[in-house]
Regions:
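Bacterial Sec-dependent N-terminal signal peptides
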Residues: 1-22
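Acidic, histidine-bearing metal-coordination/catalytic regions of metal-dependent phosphoesterases
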Residues: 20-139, 155-163, 275, 385-505, ...
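Binuclear metal-dependent phosphoesterase catalytic core
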Residues: 30-36, 328, 332-416
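Acidic/histidine-rich helix-loop elements
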Residues: 61-77, 127-151, 178, 217-226, ...
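Extended active-site neighborhood of metal-dependent phosphoesterases/phosphodiesterases
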Residues: 94-113, 179-272, 297-312, 326-363, ...
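Active-site-proximal beta-strand elements of phosphoester/diester hydrolases
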Residues: 121-135, 240-250, 279-283, 337-344
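Conserved, compact domain cores that house catalytic/ligand-binding motifs in diverse enzymes
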Residues: 121-204, 441-443, 453-455
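Short acidic, glycine-rich surface-loop motifs adjacent to enzyme active sites
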Residues: 172, 269-294
Length: 530
């Protein structure tokens, strides 16, 4: 009897499925764009059933061309993910398109192909992370995309979305549980369909993806990483910028293959005259002011490689990250390298004081708020630069509607300020309990440059091979809702207690807000008393 009932159940289920499929397929996930080049792009979507995968496209809404692709299973049901690659496109050209599966047809959308680096076209990108659902605020990801990104671009730049935004970077934690099939549609793709249907999206894995098969089925990323670890790490060029995606998750973050690959890519990038900037993205922070338990030591290896690359090549770099649910922006002391936490685009905020935190020297701004990061790349062939802007959506205590709460501009070319003049301790004898170092005002020939950091060193050796005192202070340090550097003009610094009856040497250098250091000042000398 049990066997008979099971047979009847299977038969009825099959009949229901066939009956459902006798109608038109339903688009579960609207078309989204991936892996764009000047001459090609990949378009994916998901339907309730159906094997036909067709994209109709053209340079006008009349379309006129067709490309066919593949369909494949996603969750052992009739649902199908469709993927079509169009390969006959012209560079830096706007196209219209729609997708078709059987009689089911999407709306018409638009996209724009990337330029060649030699076209010297400026562009914008968005970076944001940790949009996994907050069950106490389940619509936050939709708000960040639709009221945040899309409204910000509409207000600030006018025109069509594909003209104003080239790509979207997502450094992980796209969903709460990557092994839960339903979350991908409901919590991630559907809220962002107006964005992803017109702008290519480039994610990397976060811990919440759990290395899920669904992630690799939904996304088609550049296959230029290590073949055995396809789509775990990769790079993509857009104009004068190289974007590098990395995997900082357990089981992958310590793999020698990833670091060997990254070193080779950076070496090739240093030699590539077309590339001015490198933007890397990985999920886990090396340092986190809001949430120390979220730090990952191995991410420090990536930071060191990027720092070394930037200093040797003269090409500034950034690492975008998430995991900590808030915004932070910092900069390396000795390198033109930025640290930018681009969360949270949906996940519950890591509020000040909620977890163990620390005030790190590198970071000048940390905010426990939702939002996204806008990156504007100026491809001027003579003097390229990029600007990073934090666009905030606030938090439960402070409402913000696309308010810019932080920004920084980095030029590729050096524009060094003038070396500071030391004003104190020239062959003097002083008390060892603490010495006040003083230097002159900041000056620079660069328009708009101002004094943004000072670096002080004291040594008992003339070559500064060993340091008795060192201090690096920046012009602002927003930590726990206050600027801890308020009223510091950066022209003097008091040392710690020094050894008595000792000859010391000291020097200072200044930095502007664009990360350009002066050379070191002349060396001052002093002797401490008994």
């Amino acid at each position: 009897m049990r066997t008979t009932l099971m047979t009847i159940s299977i038969f009825l289920t099959t009949i229901c499925q066939l009956s459902a499929q006798s109608g038109n397929a339903v688009i579960l996930i609207q078309p989204y764009l991936q892996d764009a080049t000047p001459h090609s792009i990949k378009i994916s979507w998901e339907t309730t059933f159906g094997e036909e995968s067709v994209v109709e496209y053209g340079i006008t809404p009349k379309l006129g061309k067709k490309a066919r692709g593949i369909a494949f299973d996603v969750n052992f049901s009739s649902s199908r993910i469709h993927e079509v690659e169009i390969t006959d496109l012209e560079r830096f050209t706007e196209y219209y398109y729609r997708v078709r599966t059987g009689k089911t047809v999407s709306d018409i959308f638009q996209f724009k192909t990337p330029p060649f680096a030699s076209d010297n076209k400026s562009f914008n990108m968005i970076a944001m992370s940790d949009m996994q659902i907050d069950h106490n605020n389940p619509n936050k990801w939709s708000e960040v995309v639709n009221d945040g990104v899309l409204q910000y671009l509409k207000k600030e730049m006018k025109g069509k979305l594909p003209d104003n935004l080239a790509l979207v970077l997502l450094p992980g934690d796209l969903v709460e549980n990557g092994t839960n099939y339903k979350q991908w549609k409901k919590d991630f793709f559907n809220p962002a369909e107006r964005l992803f249907s017109q702008v290519p999206v480039y994610p990397v894995l976060g811990n919440h993806e759990k290395n899920s098969t669904f992630y690799f089925k939904y996304f088609s990323l550049p296959e230029n990483g290590t073949p055995a670890y396809a789509e775990h790490w990769w790079y993509k060029d857009y104009g004068n910028t190289r974007v590098i995606g990395l995997d900082s998750n357990e089981g992958f973050r310590d793999l020698k293959q990833q670091y060997d690959w990254l070193e080779k890519v950076l070496d090739d990038t240093a030699k590539n005259a077309d590339i001015d900037f490198v933007f890397a993205q990985l999920h886990h922070p090396h340092k986190s002011e809001l949430w120390i338990p979220g730090e990952e030591k191995s991410s420090g290896k990536v930071v060191e490689l990027l720092e070394d690359f930037s200093t040797k090549s003269g090409k500034p770099s950034v690492h975008f990250f998430g995991h900590t649910h808030g915004y932070s922006r910092g900069q390396s002391k000795d390198h033109k390298h930025l640290w930018v936490n681009v969360a949270s685009a949906g996940g519950a905020i890591d509020n000040w004081g909620e977890f163990e935190g620390r005030d790190y020297d590198e970071f000048t701004v940390t905010q426990d708020e939702h939002g996204f990061v806008m990156v504007e790349v100026d491809a001027d062939p003579v003097d390229p630069k990029f600007t990073i802007k934090r666009i905030s959506r606030g938090n439960s205590n402070v409402a913000r509607d696309n308010e810019m709460t932080d920004s920084i501009t980095i030029w590729k070319r050096e524009r060094k300020p003038k070396i500071p003049e030391i004003k104190s301790l020239k062959n003097e004898t002083v008390d060892s309990m603490g010495v006040m170092l003083k230097a002159g005002k900041f000056t620079s020939n660069a328009t708009g440059a101002f004094h943004a950091a000072s670096h002080w060193q004291v040594s008992d050796s003339e070559d500064f091979s060993t340091l008795a005192f060192e201090s690096w202070k920046q012009f602002e340090n927003w930590y726990y809702l206050e600027d801890r550097q308020k009223n510091d003009d950066l022209t003097d610094e008091k040392t710690n207690r020094l050894k008595a009856n000792t000859d010391y040497f000291w020097r200072v250098r200044y930095r502007d807000q664009n990360l350009n250091w002066t050379g070191w000042s002349e060396v001052g000398t002093f002797k401490t008393m008994d």
